[in-house]
Amino acid sequence: MPLGLFSSGKAQVLCDEKIPGGKKKEPKQLSENKCKGVTLKLDHTRVTIEKQIAEGGFAIVYVASDRKNNKFALKRQFTKDNEKQLEACCREHSFLKQCIGHKNIVEFVDSYTNCLGNGIWECMLLTEYHQKNVLQLMNERISQNQYLTNDEILSIFTDLCEAVSFIHNRPQPIIHRDLKVENVLISSHKPPHYVLCDFGSATTQILSVEKYGVEYVKSEVERNTTMCYRSPEMIDFYSGLEIGLKSDIWALGVLLYRLCFFCVPFEESPLAIQSVNYQFPSVPNIPDEIKVLIYMLLDIDVNRRPSIYQTSVLAFEANHRKPLSEEIQNKKCTDAVPSLKSCIQLMRDGSNPRNKRDSSPRNPEAPPIQSSSKMASLSQQVPSISNISMPSGSGTVETSVAPRLRPKATTVVPNVPSISPVPPVGLPHLRLPSKGSTDETDGSQVRKVPIDFHHRQSFSGEEQLKPAAEADSAGPLSCPLIKPTDLGFTDLDKPALPRDRAQTDGKRRLPHESDIIFQQQHRRNVSDTSQISRSAFKPYSSQQTTSKTSSQVVRSVEDMSQRQNGGSGEWNPFLVAPFSNNSISRKDGQESAFMMDDSHFGMVFDEIRRKEIPAELDSETSSIDSRDPFGAAPFDQLTVSTSSSAQPVSLPPATDEDDERQLLSETDEEEKYEIDEKEEIQTKKDETINEEDSEIDEQRMNDRRRYSYENIDGVGDDASSDSRGKTDRDDSEEEEDDDSRRGGDTSHDEDSQNTVGSEDGEGGSRPLLEDDGLEDDDDHELISSFSSSSTNYPPLFIGTSTPHTQNPITNPFLRDELTPKMIITAPLPTAKNNLDDDWDLGDRWTDRRDTVFERPASEHQNVFAPATLPRQATPLVCRFKPDLPTAAPVSIIPSMSNTSFPEAVRDSDTVPCEPIIGTLISVGAPTDPPPPPLPKKPTEASPTQETTATIPVALGKKEKLLKKEKKKEKKDGKKDKLKLEEYREKGSSEPETDGSEAEIWTNDGATTFSNKKKKKSTFGLRSSHPSIVANDLQFSSPMPPVVKKSSKDKKSSLTGKNASFVNTSFQPEDHDDPTDL
């Protein structure tokens, strides 16, 4: 049973499968798959869509068939509220109806236009169907690595010429505006016909900016044309040219180029289009008969571009057959058709390049648009008719115009355009009066002179374009200059009129009046390389030549007087500038009445010689360098004096003017000395300010430290003794020992400098520890104050009895009676042969501090780390903490410091290594290094027996000491508890700390501590860094091993909640006795 049950007998798709690539362009427009099998009714025909074959910017083309199975091409499109597009559809239908019967234009079959409501219109056009097109043919040849043959190229092009000739010769000419290979179809005849289609962009309207405006013309061009096929007048809307039939001729040239070389000549570049910048590739080998067609069609000049009739004649001549079209045969054309051979010769000679507009008159129907300023410039005229040579024979029109001349009341200078590749032509209707006399120059008196064709119009394998003006070997800018007197400079003392345009001197050729009009148009797109390539660089390329011949030029009155006097000084335009009547120039004691105006200044300024400064210079003649063009410029005297730094040039004998300059230079030198003194004073002030700033920064640093420490229960320098809790060391013997060793207090400033900024070789410039409350940027603030001294370094240890501490102690940390006392130590011995390399802490610290500071030039190694705790002026040695031992300690290892050890330990015979936790040490004042262990007397016992005998003795001593310390700790805990209760009974608001100097903060903001007594550390001072251990603090009795604290005991006694520690890195430290308050 067939599937076509519903309508036309064709297979119906019963599912909504979506084929990739189907697009929905407009409302109610169906996809490719849905449109298949759809039957549409036009005005006279009913067709069924079979498949989609093409899709354009506005419509989709389908293959449709009627009941007799005849194939048609159906162009269908929808528009919504777009009147322009709807009108374009109706025009296309109308144009194709007019072309019915032409073999090279697609045949019209039927059309349909319907309003679907809501502003939606459906437009359908039914034409004959051609299965192939030229683009497919080109793709096939590319796949076969082949090109089109010359016969195929000429056949396609001649058929297109017949089609375009038909539409151009209609009673109302039709402009296709979209000629391209995609719109050329191939019929199925033998031989095939090439058919033109797609008249959707066609129009009968000749666009003109003057008539329709720029915006309308621009929108029409962009909507209906393809970029790479656009003509130059479609690029430059301000050229004043019409966009009409000749735009199709240009598109035919681009189409022919693509047929030959499978590429477009200008790509998508408006610049290349506007400058007609293209070249012929060497492959494939295209004959000159086809190249000359491209050469003639791609002409920038609309009026010189051939018409469709001339193009058809040339094309059929190249194809060696006569035109078959009646329109071409019966065409009554008044234009002369050149022969193909003459065009080929013209192309080879290059005498009439096609990328330069000719002097042919413009279209009278649409004169070019000109701005008022440009039109006004046309009325300007040359100063003298004698300056223009107009030979009646074959000579060229030349003129010489002085640079930057202002038009005077009786002298008018024409606005001659800058030098460009535009061919020089005559001005047949331009009047050039001079001083009351008027002459007319006729076009017959002037012969056009071609210019070098410097663009990329190289015809591969052919003779290059030859310049016709090779005889003029001097160059366009090498003509002799005209003296100012010849130009009528008789009224230079009069106020000059404003000039219209700056001109540069050189050789000028007067172009045709029409070319002047064209060149003066406002080039909005500024994309014409012909206006850029030569005019921008020719003046500079010929500047050297002009300078060489400038010896014959009299540039100013000053120059003339110098030449007459035989002066060898270099002329300076600023010295003759109109600063004042008394300082212009003087000759024979008389003041000249010459007053140079701006135009004269501009002329002579361009002629400044640029030569090397002589080696022999005289500094006594003048402080102004005559070679410097700005040496005498009317600037401030201070600025003028700066030019005296350059070496002066020897000048002629001094005149009155030179005396004035000498006085000026002396005054400038005095002022310069005053300025130098002021600069020195200012430098001193700046240094003072910098010192004050450094003091302010130091004070700010101290304030930050004070603020940071005060927030952790008075650990800062300015913290009062009331803010510190009770310490865990109240031994009376140790208090007396501390009092005996403390001679006085140091001030806050000295203490802060000595504890933080002390410098002793390695130390001094190290910032505070990482967790003492300062940020990284504060550390950098400290650096600037610490690195001030480089030679004298104060001792690292501060003794209270030394001259360094003359003021009473104000540091609360030094006022603590239990704080260890510090004494100045003697310099350590330099011999460190018995030390291990791993314990060379000087190098370790150097590696760390060098990342921030530069090492002083002269310094000595110090084995002590320069870091101190906030309450400690004693240096600490950096060591890594070893892991806790699993067994009881056996012996002690003497460290690198000058620490006194028990005698039993000194007798130890172990190898030096890192101390083990739990080792009993006695930290005290630095003493001499421990002597090497004495050799033991040989005994009868074996080494194994000696070891076993020594270990029990050592273990027994250690156990006894540990027991004593535990008992003492219990007693101390009881005493501390009693003192704490007494302290609270007195009403003191300061709670006791646990020795860690860390403040407990509760949620309610109150600082409280647990009533439980924590175990105290046996070391009085511990570093905040785990690798730092107290080294040189001597206590009265040996200390037991450190007992680690657990943070679980630290809770708020009021709230019972876990407390957060502001600074948990501090280890237990000594606290003041509250009874001292």
UniProtKB/Swiss-Prot annotation:
Biased composition annotated in UniProt, kind: Low complexity: 541-554
EC identifiers of the protein: 2.7.11.1
Extent of Basic residues compositional bias: 960-969
Biased composition, class Acidic residues, residue ranges: 655-679, 770-780
Cofactor: Mg(2+)
Bias kind Pro residues: ranges: 927-936
InterPro entries attached to this UniProt entry: Kinase-like_dom_sf, Prot_kinase_dom, Ser/Thr_kinase_AS
Compositional bias ranges of the Basic and acidic residues kind: 491-515, 697-708, 739-751, 970-989
GO cellular component, one term: cytoplasm
Recorded phenotype for the gene knockout or disruption: No obvious phenotype. RNAi-mediated knockdown suppresses the egg laying defect of lin-12 n302 mutant. A similar phenotype occurs in a lin-12 and sel-5 double mutant.
Residues spanning the membrane: none
Domain of life the protein comes from: Eukaryota
Composition bias, Polar residues: 369-399, 638-648, 799-810, 941-950, 1054-1067
Catalytic center residues: D178 (proton acceptor)
Region ranges (Disordered): 347-444, 488-554, 616-813, 920-1077
Residues that coordinate or bind ATP: I53, A54, E55, G56, G57, F58, A59, I60, V61, K75
Single GO BP term: regulation of clathrin-dependent endocytosis
Catalytic reaction equation(s): L-seryl-[protein] + ATP = O-phospho-L-seryl-[protein] + ADP + H(+); L-threonyl-[protein] + ATP = O-phospho-L-threonyl-[protein] + ADP + H(+)
Domain spans labelled Protein kinase: 47-317
Purpose of the protein: Serine/threonine-protein kinase which may play a role in lin-12-mediated cell-fate decisions.
Family of this protein: Belongs to the protein kinase superfamily. Ser/Thr protein kinase family.
Protein's name according to its UniProt entry: Serine/threonine-protein kinase sel-5
Source organism phylogeny: Eukaryota, Metazoa, Ecdysozoa, Nematoda, Chromadorea
